[in-house]
């Protein structure tokens, strides 16, 4: 799932490539009379993302302005989902995880048609089907949100994401620069 979060266009490209009736190398020029698949008619691709049930969704948000507290970020997630569901209580019951440190997102249990409404809300970047961290293990990523409250922060909730991030950096040969403070020259 972490790979989808970092590169959501890979998911889109894979779906489009797999469902596209026209190949860039085919002899079909895509004339007016040719049939094309409209985006509203796309079917699910179950083998694309394992562990997806299309009942659990990951809503990725734009980063907040300034430096709000963790509780303010979580409250903004609840308010965003409440716009779609109609009440904050319903939103709190629906949310099962949040992420407030490495990326801004929340996981929620909703029906698929509601995702279209959520996508149109302010500050929502993407709505993606959520999947288990480990196939067969009914555990989703992020910090658990239980009974309307987020559990105290612990780095273990992002261990898989951090490991994937480190693996991706190693594969791509990215060497991260350490920031250094500029030293002031002493005037003599």
From Swiss-Prot:
Sequence segments annotated as region (Disordered): 169-188
InterPro entries: MORF/ORRM1/DAG-like, MORF/ORRM1/DAG-like_MORF
Location(s), subcellular: Mitochondrion
Transit peptide: 1-20
Source organism, top-level taxon: Eukaryota
Mitochondrion listed as a keyword: yes
Entry keywords, A to Z: Mitochondrion, mRNA processing, Transit peptide
GO biological process, one term: cytidine to uridine editing
Family annotation (Pfam families): MORF_dom
GO cellular component: mitochondrion
UniProt biased composition (Basic residues): 174-188
Quaternary structure annotation from Swiss-Prot or TrEMBL: Heterodimers with MORF8/RIP1, MORF5/RIP5 and MORF6/RIP6.
Function field: Involved in organellar RNA editing. Required for the processing of few RNA editing sites in mitochondria.
Similarity-based family: Belongs to the MORF family.
Name of the featured protein: Multiple organellar RNA editing factor 7, mitochondrial
Organism: Arabidopsis thaliana
């Amino acid at each position: 799932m972490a790979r989808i979060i970092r590169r959501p266009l890979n998911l889109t490209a894979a779906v489009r490539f797999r469902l596209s009736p026209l190949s860039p190398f085919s002899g079909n020029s895509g004339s007016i009379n040719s049939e094309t698949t409209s985006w509203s008619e796309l079917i699910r691709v179950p083998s694309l993302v394992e562990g997806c049930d299309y009942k659990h969704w990951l809503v990725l948000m734009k980063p907040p302005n300034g430096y709000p507290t963790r509780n303010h970020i979580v409250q903004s997630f609840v308010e965003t989902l409440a716009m779609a569901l109609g009440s904050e209580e319903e939103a709190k019951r629906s949310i099962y995880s949040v992420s407030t440190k490495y990326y801004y997102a929340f996981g929620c249990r909703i029906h698929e048609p509601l995702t279209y409404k959520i996508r149109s809300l302010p500050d929502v970047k993407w709505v993606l089907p959520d999947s288990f961290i480990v196939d067969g293990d009914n555990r989703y990523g992020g910090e658990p949100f239980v009974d309307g409250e987020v559990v105290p922060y612990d780095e273990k909730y992002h261990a898989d994401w951090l490991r994937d991030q480190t693996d991706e950096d190693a594969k791509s040969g990215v060497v991260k620069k350490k920031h250094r403070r500029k030293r002031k020259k002493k005037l003599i």
